[in-house]
Curated annotation (Swiss-Prot):
GO molecular function, one term: tRNA binding
Protein's gene: dtd
Superkingdom of origin: Bacteria
Name of the protein described by the UniProt record: D-aminoacyl-tRNA deacylase
Originating organism: Methylacidiphilum infernorum (isolate V4)
Subunit record text: Homodimer.
Length: 145
Protein backbone atom coordinates (compact mmCIF):
# COMPACT_ATOMS: atom_id res chain seq x y z
CA UNK A 1 0.00 0.00 0.00
CA UNK A 2 1.37 3.36 -1.00
CA UNK A 3 0.33 6.70 0.39
CA UNK A 4 1.56 9.98 -1.03
CA UNK A 5 1.04 12.50 1.77
CA UNK A 6 1.00 16.19 0.91
CA UNK A 7 0.62 18.98 3.44
CA UNK A 8 -1.83 21.42 1.91
CA UNK A 9 -3.36 24.81 2.58
CA UNK A 10 -6.39 23.61 0.64
CA UNK A 11 -7.38 20.88 -1.81
CA UNK A 12 -10.44 19.99 -3.85
CA UNK A 13 -11.79 17.30 -6.17
CA UNK A 14 -14.00 17.82 -9.21
CA UNK A 15 -15.60 15.25 -11.50
CA UNK A 16 -16.89 16.43 -14.89
CA UNK A 17 -16.18 20.03 -13.80
CA UNK A 18 -18.52 19.66 -10.82
CA UNK A 19 -17.20 20.10 -7.27
CA UNK A 20 -17.21 16.88 -5.26
CA UNK A 21 -15.40 17.85 -2.07
CA UNK A 22 -12.87 20.28 -0.66
CA UNK A 23 -10.73 20.74 2.44
CA UNK A 24 -8.83 23.54 4.08
CA UNK A 25 -5.54 23.14 5.93
CA UNK A 26 -4.53 19.53 6.29
CA UNK A 27 -3.38 16.51 4.31
CA UNK A 28 -4.09 15.37 0.79
CA UNK A 29 -3.53 11.60 0.70
CA UNK A 30 -3.19 9.87 -2.65
CA UNK A 31 -3.69 6.15 -1.98
CA UNK A 32 -2.61 3.18 -4.13
CA UNK A 33 -3.38 -0.44 -3.35
CA UNK A 34 -0.85 -3.02 -4.49
CA UNK A 35 -1.13 -6.76 -5.03
CA UNK A 36 -0.79 -8.54 -1.69
CA UNK A 37 -2.04 -5.60 0.39
CA UNK A 38 -4.50 -6.30 3.17
CA UNK A 39 -6.26 -4.57 6.06
CA UNK A 40 -3.09 -4.75 8.19
CA UNK A 41 -1.27 -2.61 5.61
CA UNK A 42 -4.20 -0.21 5.75
CA UNK A 43 -4.13 0.00 9.54
CA UNK A 44 -0.40 0.85 9.50
CA UNK A 45 -0.93 3.54 6.88
CA UNK A 46 -3.85 5.04 8.80
CA UNK A 47 -1.78 5.39 11.98
CA UNK A 48 1.09 6.99 10.08
CA UNK A 49 -1.12 9.48 8.24
CA UNK A 50 -3.09 10.59 11.29
CA UNK A 51 -0.06 10.78 13.59
CA UNK A 52 2.86 11.84 11.39
CA UNK A 53 4.20 15.13 12.69
CA UNK A 54 4.48 17.20 9.52
CA UNK A 55 2.93 20.46 10.74
CA UNK A 56 5.01 23.19 12.36
CA UNK A 57 4.78 24.04 16.02
CA UNK A 58 5.23 27.56 17.43
CA UNK A 59 9.00 27.35 16.98
CA UNK A 60 8.69 26.32 13.32
CA UNK A 61 9.71 22.70 13.92
CA UNK A 62 7.68 19.90 12.30
CA UNK A 63 6.25 18.60 15.53
CA UNK A 64 2.45 18.50 15.15
CA UNK A 65 0.18 15.89 13.59
CA UNK A 66 -3.06 16.29 11.66
CA UNK A 67 -4.87 15.39 14.88
CA UNK A 68 -2.93 18.04 16.82
CA UNK A 69 -3.87 20.85 14.45
CA UNK A 70 -7.40 19.54 13.90
CA UNK A 71 -6.77 19.72 10.16
CA UNK A 72 -8.75 18.13 7.39
CA UNK A 73 -7.95 15.05 5.31
CA UNK A 74 -8.76 14.41 1.65
CA UNK A 75 -8.23 10.83 0.44
CA UNK A 76 -7.94 10.29 -3.31
CA UNK A 77 -7.56 6.85 -4.92
CA UNK A 78 -4.48 6.91 -7.19
CA UNK A 79 -3.54 3.55 -8.71
CA UNK A 80 -0.75 5.09 -10.82
CA UNK A 81 1.41 5.34 -7.69
CA UNK A 82 1.81 1.56 -8.05
CA UNK A 83 3.14 2.01 -11.59
CA UNK A 84 6.74 1.44 -12.58
CA UNK A 85 8.73 2.76 -15.52
CA UNK A 86 11.65 0.34 -15.46
CA UNK A 87 11.92 -0.43 -19.16
CA UNK A 88 11.05 1.77 -22.05
CA UNK A 89 8.76 4.75 -21.71
CA UNK A 90 5.38 3.24 -20.91
CA UNK A 91 4.44 2.57 -17.28
CA UNK A 92 3.59 -0.91 -16.09
CA UNK A 93 0.86 -1.37 -13.50
CA UNK A 94 1.62 -5.02 -12.76
CA UNK A 95 1.99 -4.25 -9.05
CA UNK A 96 -1.41 -2.55 -8.76
CA UNK A 97 -4.12 -4.64 -7.15
CA UNK A 98 -7.09 -5.63 -9.32
CA UNK A 99 -9.84 -3.00 -9.23
CA UNK A 100 -12.28 -5.02 -7.10
CA UNK A 101 -9.60 -5.75 -4.47
CA UNK A 102 -8.31 -2.18 -4.53
CA UNK A 103 -11.80 -0.70 -4.12
CA UNK A 104 -12.50 -2.95 -1.15
CA UNK A 105 -9.26 -1.88 0.57
CA UNK A 106 -9.72 1.79 -0.36
CA UNK A 107 -13.19 1.64 1.21
CA UNK A 108 -11.72 -0.10 4.27
CA UNK A 109 -8.98 2.51 4.76
CA UNK A 110 -11.25 5.50 4.19
CA UNK A 111 -13.95 3.99 6.42
CA UNK A 112 -11.52 3.28 9.26
CA UNK A 113 -10.14 6.81 9.05
CA UNK A 114 -13.68 8.24 9.10
CA UNK A 115 -14.39 6.16 12.24
CA UNK A 116 -11.33 7.66 13.97
CA UNK A 117 -11.45 11.20 12.62
CA UNK A 118 -14.44 13.13 11.35
CA UNK A 119 -12.80 15.83 9.19
CA UNK A 120 -12.39 13.49 6.20
CA UNK A 121 -13.43 13.84 2.57
CA UNK A 122 -12.70 11.45 -0.28
CA UNK A 123 -12.58 11.19 -4.02
CA UNK A 124 -14.39 8.49 -5.98
CA UNK A 125 -12.74 5.19 -6.78
CA UNK A 126 -12.44 4.62 -10.53
CA UNK A 127 -13.49 8.14 -11.51
CA UNK A 128 -11.51 10.55 -13.67
CA UNK A 129 -11.00 13.40 -11.23
CA UNK A 130 -9.50 16.85 -11.34
CA UNK A 131 -7.57 17.40 -8.13
CA UNK A 132 -6.64 20.94 -7.14
CA UNK A 133 -4.29 21.74 -4.30
CA UNK A 134 -2.19 24.44 -2.79
CA UNK A 135 0.86 22.83 -1.26
CA UNK A 136 2.01 24.07 2.11
CA UNK A 137 5.80 24.07 2.01
CA UNK A 138 5.79 22.05 -0.18
CA UNK A 139 5.90 19.08 2.18
CA UNK A 140 5.42 15.66 0.57
CA UNK A 141 6.11 12.17 1.92
CA UNK A 142 5.87 8.79 0.22
CA UNK A 143 4.70 6.05 2.60
CA UNK A 144 4.86 2.34 1.83
CA UNK A 145 3.14 0.06 4.29
Amino acid sequence: MIGLVQRVKQAAVEIDQLPVCAIGRGILLFLAIEKGDNEKNGDLLIEKVLNCRIFSDQSGKMNLSLLDIRGELLIVPEFTLAGKIAKGKRPSFDMAAPAEVAKKLFDYVSGQIENKYKAVKKGYFGADMSVYLINDGPVTFWLKC
